[in-house]
């Protein structure tokens, strides 16, 4: 789960985080914890027609841009009976039945889609998009809880990142017109690439490192123990 455990520990201290969290397992909601065993298997879900993703609970996923939709889950066999994945109004909703908290040695997803407009996490999420993403549509990432994101080669008109809680987001090789980044709580966001206009807001104990970002029009606002580092 990469760095997510340390961020969950920090999130417990953040008033903005309202999720009951158990460090001994993936416990994000108020449902019971189920221990899932069995051989590791891979299943493909027949889900298409979405341009947004909402995670309610926990996810460890890799994201790819492609012409065809694909939702693949690799996990211990017992995990699949608890998954409740569906598409609602163009949004891929990823959650568990009765909001149970899954504890498993293996539980990871691979998602391919043509266009991603919004990624919202209500809980905790490890997410990688390292092979690049280009679109004429705006992109928004919202984390309510804890997150560890590695994003590379994002090329969109407008890119918004909002971190409410704790986490670590790295966005490298950005090529955007407008960039808006906000941290409410504790978190680190590292940015590199270029933007025509950028705004950075941090409330709490967060850090934004934009020293690798080329941008002449930048506005900043911070409070608490926040820090914002710009390219000089």
Regions found by a protein language model. Give the residues of each.
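Intrinsically disordered, low-complexity terminal regions
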Residues: 1-232
């Amino acid at each position: 789960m990469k760095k997510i455990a340390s961020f969950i520990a920090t999130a417990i201290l953040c008033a903005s985080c309202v999720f009951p969290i158990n460090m001994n397992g993936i416990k994000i909601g108020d449902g019971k914890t189920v221990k899932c065993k069995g051989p590791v298997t891979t299943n493909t879900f027949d889900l298409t027609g979405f341009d947004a993703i909402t995670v309610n609970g926990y996810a460890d996923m890799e994201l790819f841009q492609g012409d065809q939709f694909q939702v693949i889950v690799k996990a211990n066999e017992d995990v699949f009976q608890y998954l409740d994945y569906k598409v609602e109004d163009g949004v891929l909703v990823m959650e568990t039945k009765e909001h149970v908290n899954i504890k498993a040695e293996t539980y990871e997803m691979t998602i391919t889609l043509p266009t991603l407009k919004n990624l919202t996490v209500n809980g905790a999420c490890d997410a990688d998009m390292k092979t690049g993403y280009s679109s004429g549509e705006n992109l928004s990432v919202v984390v309510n809880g804890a997150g560890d994101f590695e994003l590379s080669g994002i090329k969109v008109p407008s890119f918004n990142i909002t971190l409410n809680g704790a986490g670590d987001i790295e966005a490298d090789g950005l090529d955007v017109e407008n960039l808006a980044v906000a941290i409410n709580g504790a978190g680190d966001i590292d940015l590199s690439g270029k933007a025509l206009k950028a705004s950075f807001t941090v409330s709490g104990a967060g850090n934004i490192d934009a020293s690798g970002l080329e941008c002449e029009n930048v506005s900043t606002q911070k409070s608490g123990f926040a820090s914002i580092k710009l390219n000089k």
